[in-house]
Amino acid sequence: MQGTEETEANRRNRISELPDCILLHIMSFLEARDVVRTCILSKRWKDLCKRLTTLAYIPSWDENSFKNIQSWVLSSRDQSCSLRNLTIDTRFLEGEEDLHTLVQYALFHNLQHLNIKINPSLTPKPELLPLILTSHSLTFHELSYRRGKAAVKSPILLKSLHLPALRTLHLEYVNFVATHDHYVDPFSNLRALNTLVLMFCALIEDALVLCISNQTLSSLTIFGVPSADEFLLSTPNLSSFTILGCPIFQQLLSSTCNLSFLQQVNIDGFSEGIGTASVFLSWLQVLANVKISKIGYSVIRALDYVSHSSILSLLLLIKTIIWILKYVRRCQCSL
């Protein structure tokens, strides 16, 4: 028994003897409350958590837990250390001021990755979004407002984004308003953007056309955005395009460029509705340069509900054969 206890003690000592960089890396996978608790383990751990550059807050039953974490960050964390990654899941009903203060602190400490999930019962301070949009350090931002079908009531309205270092943007349940002539064009000023994901977003007021205008964008995913009458692409470097859960037999797709770098298109999740096959045919024409196209069964099945379905099915079959032949030729040339 004594030998077992000594073995356990040695194991604990071995962990404590690891370099700070390794311990900090291990701690980056812990939830914020557990990170703070490590300070009571020993003198070796007392101040280690204060230099952690990654914090993730997951809600608990304790209503004061978020306030406590926010207070610890402001009062005890090493102010000379950058805070690179911050994840906040706000399932609590209150704490607008605490949320704003913590995000502000992080942005002033060279924050690069920001992931925020906001509870429907929580209304963030109006200053929160403009605060985020002034960041020159953010490279990744995910914002989920969790408004569900009530997204139209969301106070978060984005006209234009100005984050010079941002490479990945994920927006969920966010509203857009028109910038000019019924057009929504919020992404054209993101000079480093590579990946864009839009989920359950809405165009409100007089906005009708969603413009995805960006010179550097490579990957685009649109999921459940039925309020747009048209999607307009101005993305010369786009290589991957996924659209799911949209009424593509009713929504137009156009492009200002030939999308010559487009490698793969995924279309699925279509819900039946009134529309014409000619609309979807125009999609195929816009996406004519794609190398690989994956069209889900829901789209094929929907062809039975629209006019000229037999013609469209034939065109789709012919186009698929052409794609396959082109791919085989490229493979043969590479051998």
Predicted segments — roles?
Residues 1-2, 284:
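Short, polybasic Lys/Arg-rich linear motifs in disordered N-terminal/cytosolic regions
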Residues 78-91, 112-119, 138-141, 263-268, ...:
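LRR N-terminal entry segment and analogous cap-like coil->beta motifs
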Residues 113, 177, 199, 203-204, ...:
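Extracellular beta-strand scaffolds
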Residues 148, 176, 201-203, 246-248, ...:
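Hydrophobic lipid-interacting interfaces of membrane-associated proteins
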Residues 322-335:
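C-terminal, well-structured subdomains that either form a transmembrane helix-short loop-helix hairpin
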